[in-house]
Amino acid sequence: MSAEKKHDYHLVDPSPWPIYVSFSCLVLAIGTIFYMHNDVSWGMYLGLALVLYGAYMWFRDVVIEAEHQGHHTPVVQIHHRYGMTLFIASEVMFFVAWFWAYFDISLFPNEFVGNVWPPKDIETFDPWDIPLINTLVLLLSGTTVTWAHHSLIESDRKGFIQGLTLTVILGFFFTLLQAYEYHHATFDYSGHIYGAVFYMATGFHGFHVIIGTIFLAVCLARAKKGHFTKDHHFGFEAAAWYWHFVDVVWLFLFAAIYVWGS
């Protein structure tokens, strides 16, 4: 009786994955730096593989705790929501830094960019071509993920799965269009401030889209296994929050960099 749980909190068991993922991120960061400076890519790909494996194992344990061990009580879910809110807030500040850098150099161009913005040797993208299509794709994906959420709340499992499926497809389509745009760009990320800021801002957003697509794909796989109910679905709710955040960031990127900046 002394070991009986008398509270609603989850005292997590020791896990190797936090420290493993931390070191994997270090390998990924160092590998990326070497790739940018020396065009040596194996370290970056090794770090990425290590991070993906660690994330898979870590989230697998979290799913087991939630679905099979019953550790995610209503009190625990409240704190999960607090945590996700703080995480998204930190991501907002991350993008604020890149918007700040962009507007600082574009509103006050110096001699390094020829005192004009965009620089004269830069051929900007037509905002009403692929960028507009990507905007419509993400707006539509925001609608489909909301449809999935409402279907789950109404216990419509079929609508939930259909909405998630469409959202994942749209996220993948956005990434393909972004890759196509990068491939046909007339400038790269090195050599001038325009390319650096453009690729860091839109590239990190693209990375977030990939992460969000994987997040939602995992939710889709879990949904097909019968996971998530209208009263217990924070895993999907967190993915939906993250996806809406990605949508909003893209609207600002589209307006600031593609439309105004062109």
Tell me the role of every PLM-derived stretch.
Residues 1-262:
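...captures the hydrophobic TM-helix bundle architecture rather than a specific catalytic motif
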